[in-house]
A protein has these predicted regions:
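Alpha-helical recognition domains of nuclear gene-regulatory proteins
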Residues: 27, 72, 98-101, 217-220, ...
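GST-like fold's C-terminal all-alpha helical module
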Residues: 116-271, 276, 330-333, 337-364, ...
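Juxtamembrane amphipathic/hinge helix adjacent to a transmembrane helix
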Residues: 266, 273-346
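GST-like domain detector, emphasizing the conserved glutathione-binding G-site
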Residues: 2-155, 162, 311, 315-412
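Short amphipathic alpha-helical interaction elements and helix-loop-helix interfaces
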Residues: 34, 75, 79, 224-227, ...
Length: 412
């Protein structure tokens, strides 16, 4: 039986926009025979019970996350598809330690580089998602992914890379100071700072912290690599090599307006950068979004086109978005996903059928409402429109009265 590897789709001439997906692709390319697997750019987390990609489908069974997939391949092949089989005891310890180190530190840097940094997100990352996603995911997924990246990196104190958040914070501070009477009237309406000014201040404030973060990841990896061909051996790669390729390819390859991560990799650790480029060419190749959707497979990777988007899938997406945005419901769903990472649909409880039906109904209703809501507004009776207009005028008058009262109090 052929294994199906489902991933987030191609971006930046790489086969995936996600580092874990890239690492898994590199692992498959290095150890699994080409005729034993296919690569599917489903770009849809709902294919996996844990709501995660990458995910491997073996018949009715799904396995997600890089490390789980590596372990599954070892068991599936009776040890034949194991990149770490040749490692000594000490090398296995280094493999575990540096793999954890690469995943944790690499994820934070990719979050900052492609998602938190405003120029890179809007100029490169968001359009890349638009090229691989269908409606409504192309509007939901990029924002959701960026918000998650902001939460993961919030403790680093580098929110100034997000120019929107920086400007919003400045505006809130200005309004608070105005309300408290701390700013003279002559300074209340000074011109807003331009993007260029903000970029200058952001770069200056964040430079030293970013240099520290990049050095913490790149320098130990280059020291471990040394003059060897691979991270832990001079003869063959390991699962650590796959992870390093996955994360550092997204640091080296994307063309972005603010390439601070690529510059750090090239200038601080040039040997590591050459290694990443060599391994990328060997195991990932150069890919376009069209390759993933082509009906005629070709190239370095065994692509298979994903299934077409159906009304049921759209409904399921809208249903999941609504469910994950509901506090109590979202927590219940998370616990259910964590309960069985290697989920088998054939053993699923029967109530999942009801949830699927509810997803289709709810999603279809939401889609219909989305398309027809403007028309419903236009068809309101004239009396209703007049009442709405009068209510809005009343609210504006109340706001004006409140402003006048504040002015009077300031004079007193």
């Amino acid at each position: 039986m052929v294994l199906e590897l489902h991933i987030w789709g191609p971006a930046f001439s790489l086969p995936s926009i996600d580092p874990q997906c890239l690492a898994t692709i590199a692992y498959f390319s290095a150890v699994v025979p080409r005729d034993a697997w296919v690569l599917v750019a489903s770009s849809d987390v709902s294919v996996s019970r844990t709501n995660e990609l990458p995910a491997v489908k073996d018949g009715s069974r799904w396995v997600s996350k890089f490390r789980n997939i590596v372990n599954y391949l070892r068991e599936y092949s009776n040890g034949q598809w194991d990149l770490d089989a040749h490692l000594s005891g000490l090398e296995k310890a280094d493999n575990i330690a540096f793999s954890t180190f690469t995943e944790s530190n690499g994820q934070l840097l990719i979050d900052l580089y492609l998602y938190v940094t405003s120029q890179n997100y809007y100029a490169a990352t968001s359009p890349a998602y638009g090229a691989i996603l269908a409606w409504p995911n192309q509007w939901i997924t990029p924002v959701k992914t960026r918000n998650a990246a902001k939460r993961r990196t919030d403790h680093l104190g580098l929110s100034s890379l997000d120019l929107e958040a920086t400007e919003e914070q400045r505006e809130r501070e200005r309004l608070s100071a105005t309300a408290a009477g701390q700013i003279p009237q002559s300074l209340l309406y000074r011109p807003r700072e331009t993007v260029t000014t903000l970029l200058g201040k952001t770069a200056q404030a964040s430079r030293f912290r970013l240099e520290s973060l990049t050095a913490e990841l790149f320098e130990p990896l280059q020291e471990l690599l040394g003059k060897k061909s691979y991270m832990l051996s001079d003869t063959q790669p390991s699962s650590l090599d796959a992870l390093v390729i996955g994360y550092l390819s997204l640091a080296l390859v994307p063309e972005v307006p603010s390439p601070w991560l690529r510059d750090a990799l090239l200038t601080k650790t040039p040997l590591l950068a050459k290694y990443v480029e060599r391994m990328r060419q060997q195991y990932l190749g150069v890919v376009s979004a069209a390759d993933a959707f082509s009906q005629t497979p070709g190239g370095k990777l065994p692509w298979r086109p994903p299934e077409s988007v159906t009304v049921g899938k759209i409904g399921n997406t809208l249903f999941n978005t609504l469910a994950d945005a509901t506090p109590i419901w979202s927590e219940i769903r998370k616990r259910e996903r964590l309960r069985d990472p290697a989920f088998q649909p054939s053993k699923a409880p029967s109530h999942n059928l009801l949830l699927t039906a509810a997803a289709i109904v709810a999603g279809t209703t939401a889609a219909v409402s989305y398309f027809f809501y403007p028309g419903l507004l236009k068809s309101l009776p004239l009396g209703s429109a007049d009442a709405k207009q009068k209510e809005e005028e009343k609210q504006r008058d109340e706001v004006m009265d409140l402003g006048s009262a504040q002015d009077l109090l300031s004079v007193l």
